Amino acid sequence: MTLRQLTLLAAFLFCLMFSLLQSHAQIPPQKPIWEPEIRAFEKKDHTQPPPPNAVLFVGSSSIRKWTTLADDFPGVTLINRGFGGSQIDDSTAFSSRIIIPYHPRLIVFYAGDNDLAAGKSPAQVFGEYTNFVTVVHAQLPQTRIIFISIKPSLDRWKLRDKIMETNHRIAALPEPYLSFVDIYPSMLGPDGTPEKDLFLSDGLHPSEKCYRLWASFIRPYLN
């Protein structure tokens, strides 16, 4: 098979995969509880239109509370659309309002531990993430999505086995335009438990030191 034939075959397979993704996309319902936060984002977008070709950070409170983004990624055009307490399906549900309109060059996504804490299984969380990818890539097929691994935490240490299983499943995804950033091992101390100074007093949300650690893993993807 010639190089040209291989190129055409690769293009055909990519188009076929893209068509399959579109046909299997499922948009979850938009929960009213998040409407005030989403409307606040939309109001901000109207008064201060977000810049094009930005890096979009989206997900749960671990993204929303990342107030040092600009300092951690100097010179990078950023948008933060984290909303606290949300699960993966919530970001999918509101993707038409807080993801797709921005046409970001890169999406950095963190969510999943709220899902597990709510009683969902690793298989369910994995399914929600693959659906998120399907929905987003149906509209933005060449936008890379970086999944920050679900973190270990003091408050949810009992969920560590489910967290590790979920991370393992997501890390194995072979799709193009997907990356998995594994911050889990680096958040553990010599005794194998989460480092206390990487968390706020609630033992759940990241401290500034933790965000600096995360940034060191993510930064290479932004260049």
What are the roles of these predicted feature ranges?
Residues M1-V55, I63, T67, D71-D72:
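N-terminal secretory targeting modules
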Residues L140-R144:
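A short helix->loop->beta-strand "cap" motif at the edges of active sites that frequently abuts
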Residues I63-I79, I88-F126, I146, I150-L154:
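Oxyanion-hole/transition-state-stabilizing segment in secreted/luminal serine hydrolases
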Residues L16, L154-N223:
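Catalytic His-Asp segment of secreted/periplasmic serine-dependent ester chemistry enzymes
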Residues P122-F132, K162-N167:
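Charged helix-capping and loop-helix junction motifs
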Residues L56-V58, I79:
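Conserved beta-strand elements of the Class I
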Residues V58-G59, G112, I183:
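A secondary-structure boundary/capping signal
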